């Protein structure tokens, strides 16, 4: 039975083979602080910090405005062009760690309704 398409703008794809989990300890303190600021701005519980940080680490290793040439994904949470509008200032938010985090938070809670659910999905599929 084929996998059910759950989100119209993201095609079903297989997980990454040979994937190794990245440690959150490599994310700079300034980026972790930006995540906490974004969580406050988006009224997200502090209890979700570790799950959000973990997702960010797997997606970008905490590198602001990072680009993925293969998918055109961008930023700390690797938003696709269709999600750029989730950032407070759209595409202009890239380069601002707090605003990139806000866009990622909005994507995660809009699609998965919790950071824990998004992390669980990521751990199973190696993408979100």
What is the predicted function of each stretch?
Residues 30, 34, 38-41, 50, ...:
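Catalytic cores of secreted/periplasmic lytic hydrolases that degrade extracellular macromolecules
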Residues 60-67, 86, 127-128:
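Secretory-pathway/luminal and periplasmic proteins that interact with or process carbohydrate-rich
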Residues 90-99:
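A short, structured beta-strand-centered segment in the mid-to-C-terminal lobe
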Residues 69-88:
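Substrate-binding/active-site groove segments that recognize
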Residues 47-63, 101-108, 118-123:
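Short, functionally critical alpha-helical segments immediately adjacent to catalytic or ligand/cofactor-binding
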């Amino acid at each position: 039975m084929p996998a059910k398409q759950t989100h119209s703008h993201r095609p079903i794809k297989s997980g990454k083979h040979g994937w190794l989990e990245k440690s959150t300890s490599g994310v700079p303190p300034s980026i972790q602080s930006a995540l906490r600021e974004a969580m406050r701005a988006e009224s997200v519980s502090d209890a979700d910090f570790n799950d959000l940080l973990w997702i960010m680490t797997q997606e970008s290793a905490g590198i602001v405005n990072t680009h993925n040439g293969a998918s055109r994904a961008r930023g700390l949470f690797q938003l696709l062009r269709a999600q750029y509008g989730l950032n407070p200032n759209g595409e202009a938010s890239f380069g601002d760690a707090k605003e990139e985090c806000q866009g990622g938070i909005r994507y995660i809670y809009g699609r998965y309704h919790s950071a824990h659910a998004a992390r669980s999905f990521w751990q199973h599929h190696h993408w979100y």
